[in-house]
Amino acid sequence: MDTKTFTKKYYVDRKNTDCIKWDDKAAKGKLPMFIADMDFKTEDKINAALASRIKHGSYGYTFLPEDYYDTLNAWNKKRNNITYKKEAIRFSKGAVDAIIQIIHALTKEKDAILITTPVYPPFFGSVKTTKRTLVTSSLIRTNGLYTFNYEDIEKKFKEKKVKVLILCSPHNPLGRVWTKKELDKLFALTHKYHVLVISDEVHSDIIMSGHKFIPSLSFKKYENEIITITALSKTFSLAIFAHCHIVIPNKKLRDKFDKYQNEYHLASVNAFCAYPSYYGYKYGEEWLDSLNKVVEENYCYLCLRLGKYVDILPLEGTYLAFVDFKGYTKNAYKFLYEKCDLMATAGEKFDAKCATWARLNLATSLANVKKACDAIEKELKK
């Protein structure tokens, strides 16, 4: 499906639906390009299957469809050449919830946890709320791309006695899809220093042409030291259906995690929330391929219009563009909000040093991207 046809068929006006993105009081009168969800309806067959379940009218206790795991693995095998053993998969209501559960189950208070910055803000909170010790390592820019500062990471591993690394793959907000070489070098360090990796891969289906997502658990030699979190919440805009997978190949770690989940009654899966993912894995591939084309088209347009003024990071994955307005303002969020009537995500949320940066959500219509570019360019020309 071409981008125009997709947008015409699936773009939806979300105003007055209790939508955080469009109905937030702060977004009134502004073009919202902040929170990471889409302005597109999910795939028709997913909606139809859900409607059929609702029409039945009974919402008693149930379990997952018999072929749920086979359907999940068929998707993963086709798109990323990986499958996960059924016994290794656990569930949670979301990536952040999963990270917090893993930290509670497998570490102790004051244990050091490293995150690479700038990064998705809840990573910071997940360390602080669990009373662990936050350690950060700044990503470094080389030839226009941000990558890991391996020397600094190794230094922190040694000096801070780091127990866990939380990895964002693909990276939010930098849009990186880590290469096999980058990940192999990183995991060699985590292996050397006995650091557990929690790999948040919820954006892994949103990949631009010319790039290939590498699942962390595809490195078989390190799989016992890695826990992966996957979901279709970003893929098909299913955020209200709180459902994600936690893949734990290491049985000793899995047993500890199971003990924690069982102790706090967290082990059950909400089957109704799992259904949209199940239907997405079965029916959503063509829809997703079209969506990725829309995101890429929007990104190319953004670069064409604004690239001569501001620093726009290359977008390899996710539908989130990270833009530096340095030279025009000291605070990109305020500049966009007050001058351009546009609500973005403030760069300093990802790192205190990123106040001149803003994250823009491109999972919307090209018309909205054009409107945003018109407003921004008008101010940049002044």
Where are these regions (language model features)?
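Walker B catalytic acidic pair
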Residues: 201
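N-terminal small-domain helix-loop-helix segment of the aminotransferase-like
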Residues: 2-94, 101, 382
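Conserved core segment of the aminotransferase class I/II
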Residues: 48-52, 224-296, 304, 378-380
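PLP-dependent enzyme catalytic core of the Aspartate aminotransferase-like
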Residues: 155, 331, 335-344, 350-382
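Conserved core of the PLP fold type I
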Residues: 59-188, 205-206, 211-219, 223, ...
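Conserved glycine-rich beta-strand-loop-beta hairpin in the small C-terminal domain of fold type I
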Residues: 274, 278, 294-303, 312-325, ...
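Short hydrophobic/aromatic beta-strand micro-patches
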Residues: 247, 322-324, 361-363
